[in-house]
Amino acid sequence: GYTWADSAPVVSLLETLEALTEYQRAGKIRYIGVSNETAFGVMRYLHLADKHDLPRIVTIQNPYSLVNRSYEVALAEVSQFEGVELLAYSCLAFGTLTGKYLNGAKPAGARNTLFSRFTRYSGEQTQKAVAAYVDIAKRHNLDPAQMALAFVRL
């Protein structure tokens, strides 16, 4: 696990937002977004932008898939009401939603074969869910990966 070090340098959210504003005004970036942020963090950025007349963040890049729906807990509400769009990543859950790892399969060259420490999507519950999703896809003549990506596009 991660151990917080009180002596670690911290850059305030306001200072970060001011620096990004300078880049935007200089034409080096068009918009400001965040990645792997919480609903609280997004709302703090938005509050500071409004309070100090700075550009608001417009995107959040977080994981989102059929088997990782944590975005829906609070961030979806922030996105809807504050206009902060999701740029989803890990939409195939490290390739798990393709079905290629079902029944303990370890395809040569596949991410979970090469990097076995990535076990986030290898648990029993996830494997059961993936098997059900793959079954649904096959019954409807869909590619499991296409079905998983279509879910994220909704």
Language-model features: locations:
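Glycine/proline-rich, positively charged
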Residues: G1-V67
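Soluble or luminal CAZymes and related metallo-dependent hydrolases
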Residues: S12-T16, E37, Y71, Q125-A129, ...
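Surface-exposed amphipathic alpha-helices with a cationic face
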Residues: T21-Q24, L46-A49, A76-Q80, V134-K138
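Conserved short secondary-structure transition element at the edge of the structured enzyme core
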Residues: Q24, C91, T113, T119-L154
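Conserved, mostly hydrophobic/aromatic
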Residues: I32, I60, S79, L86-Y89, ...
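Glycine-rich beta-alpha junction loops
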Residues: T38, Y64-N68, S90-L97, F151
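Hydrophobic packing residues within well-ordered alpha-helices of enzyme cores
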Residues: V42-Y45, S79, L97, V152
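Aromatic-lined glycan-binding groove of carbohydrate-active enzymes
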Residues: Y71-A110, L142-D143
